[in-house]
């Protein structure tokens, strides 16, 4: 057998393995028994891989790889999203840098430019996903602007339109004056800002209780130009006399009424609230209830429209300053307060959003949200972790009609056509330039495009042939799982459920797996502007894809957010290092080195059944069976963090540190062949279990391994797969026969004794060759088990004498270790200077006591606790707790010498 290279280099090995997989066609859809279908959440076509993508894709690949190895019919659909506003913004910026305006070149040429941009940059993220080792079918990549996908989008719109679920209406929307398009509530980003609350005087048309004016409080004085009323709370008796009266609106001289409305908070400002129905959603509701005029004072760029004198042509910021100045000059600025408040911003360009009354297209959700709620409440769709169910149901219960129109050029154009001659209007699945009603040729299509989420809501079924080839969905829909971020439970997940139930009468997926948000090391969100983001490709270049994937999977706990351990250069914004990913790489190296050692000792090996010949074999096979069950079940239940950490604990701490150590002596004796078979059985099973987590290194090792019992057919002939990724998965049912609780208990006792001896050597810096006198006290049953392992314990612990019994006495001058109900005493007399050791320990105790007293004094200082940063206070508390634990341990050690 050819010897494995001494070192494993991810930078050269991983690309070579990737090419092997691609050349072998192993990523392609495979048919089998049972199905596992996953549709990758489509990243923006012009985007690049970020830590969220890397986490998401690592989870999905683990699911798919295990399913493929279990012989299931697997389909992992890859695709990208056209990302309407994101792509249009980038292309717009590019054209401007070339001195070109999209308005100059027109819609058709601009859309062509978007396609050019998509073709030029669209493949970057797909290549990055490929480099991660994600086993998607790259030959069947989908795009939300593909012709057949566009037909699906169009059919959905037309069906909902004709079913009365899509309508056009005037509503308050979140408007971005920079992108000049509507933005959904769920896409708006709230930012805390320092602002002001201006108190303005509005003159009464006739005095009330001796007052000539009222005072309204507002954070947006510029919108007063569009005020059409003033509201007070019905709970405020002091304002009752003003109800039914009117004020003369300054600047515009518009007489507007004062009325009562339950929307008003009597404790806000003076209790009088200006009402601007065209520029505030609450005011819009009050305006509807009280039949107030809706006056839009801004155009689509948030510039004051004609009819407002000196204010016309001002942008909203200029208008604010001018209005405040006017009120101040006319003695109507009562006073100003500083105010911290939350302001909505566009998620794409960061401009402050403008509540703006405009005509838009909407989906009426009342008929859609009920079935979507039932799907989750009945368990047809299950969230993991379960707490995200509440996020889904709360959003769905409070769902308002969905604004689906966007004032963009790049995207799915709304398929509604209008006849200018006869007023005909209809939604059509095919374009037309002739009116079917009057035969006229003055027909035009709606200028708006659909919200990106409208098209992506169809992702699980439109990517698999619907509606053209619905038979392709058979066995693959509902899909197995959707792995995604919590940020888009409302934007995407809920809408996918609504549309799938409506058009297919089934849910789009059975499980929704929400992974934690990956934060920067300091707990802040990763972002380009902060320069604290980590590029997954930098991690792969530094540590390899396996190390990155494994580290990310260990972070997939039930926590909502997790900090990623990475150090970033503040000047260059480049990755310096990632200690946790470095540790993950060490695990990859351990797997390689342990496998290489075993394969170097396989001379004369032939495949055959594993046989329990020693207590270590029985223990290892039992632990192996439990590892098979643990990995399989935890991938099935989507508890990836527990699974990943459990794999390392098993392979490193149990297989490498103990079983290989105990068994390697047998490789030199008469039992060599059976020891080889047992070791290869354990190694092969372990490598298969770790493959979904770390596919590259496991594939490379497996390629160097001889056949094991797992590769033998019913007649005992070798029938080995071409690649590990299509080899057979270790099924828990096949390993259940190896579970042996007694054998596990016996060997755990052995490990306790040996570990106590080794820990004593380490603590007191004793030579590994120094033989120790060890005394073990335990129950009779455990002593019997330990005696059966005496021949294993003595060489591993390197004992001069080993006394074991239920009633043995604690030797003088010995250190005690208690674990698993067993007391292990290691005699130190003659091995260390007891008096010097005791003096050293007492000195450490005194130092720890002194430091603890200082910590407690500081923490008792109320000024420190109140004024110091919470993190500093907590650090001091943690240190005090740590010192107490140290003192307990040191005191116990001193007692050992007494």
Residue ranges and their predicted role:
Residues 1-51, 74, 347, 591:
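Non-catalytic terminal extensions that flank enzyme cores
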Residues 120-131, 252, 456-466, 553-554, ...:
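Glycine-rich, acidic and aromatic/proline-enriched surface loops and short helix-turn segments
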Residues 30-91, 153, 216-219, 223, ...:
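N-terminal catalytic cores of NTP/NDP-binding nucleotidyl/phosphoryl-transfer enzymes
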Residues 60-61, 221-301, 324, 328, ...:
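Catalytic alpha/beta core of large soluble enzyme barrels
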Residues 199, 394-454, 458, 502-545, ...:
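Feature 926 captures the class I aminoacyl-tRNA synthetase adenylation module centered on the KMSKS loop
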Residues 48, 54, 79, 160, ...:
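Conserved phosphate/anionic-ligand binding catalytic regions in large, soluble enzymes, centered on
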Residues 65-73, 94-104, 127, 131-136, ...:
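Secondary-structure transition/capping motifs at alpha-helix termini
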Residues 2, 7, 16, 20-24, ...:
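Residue patterns forming the tRNA-binding/recognition surfaces of aminoacyl-tRNA synthetases
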